[in-house]
């Protein structure tokens, strides 16, 4: 992630409410996935793993914010687990397919949180 992106995310986080933080967290995940795809193209496998781990950690942050008094949280939790597992598989296989599958699901959720 570029230094400017980090500064932008930091500024936005300091000015956001709870739902805004969720949206920003998704955007951080997408930035890390972009970093992983770039590292993959350049065959920089250590950077690839680091970016995927950071994306997994950000998904973990989303999981920690779930309120299980709502039924939808259980469904979101399962989706997040699937996405984390997909990124682990991508790391193990050195594959973009699993990244794209996880990103597709996360982008759909991101769109719903943006509304």
What is the meaning of each model-derived region?
Residues 1-35, 39-42, 46-52, 57, ...:
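N-terminal intrinsically disordered, cationic/polar leader segments
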């Amino acid at each position: 992630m570029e230094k400017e992106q980090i500064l932008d995310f930091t500024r936005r986080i300091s000015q956001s409410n709870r739902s805004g933080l969720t949206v920003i967290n998704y955007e951080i995940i997408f930035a890390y996935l972009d970093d992983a795809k770039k590292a993959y193209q350049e065959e920089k496998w250590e950077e690839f793993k680091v970016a995927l781990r950071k994306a997994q950690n950000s998904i973990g942050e989303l999981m920690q914010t779930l309120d299980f008094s709502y039924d939808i949280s259980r469904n979101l939790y399962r989706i997040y687990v699937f996405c984390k597992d997909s990124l682990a598989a991508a790391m193990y296989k050195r594959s973009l397919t699993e990244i794209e599958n996880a990103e597709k699901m996360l982008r759909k959720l991101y769109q719903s949180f943006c509304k």
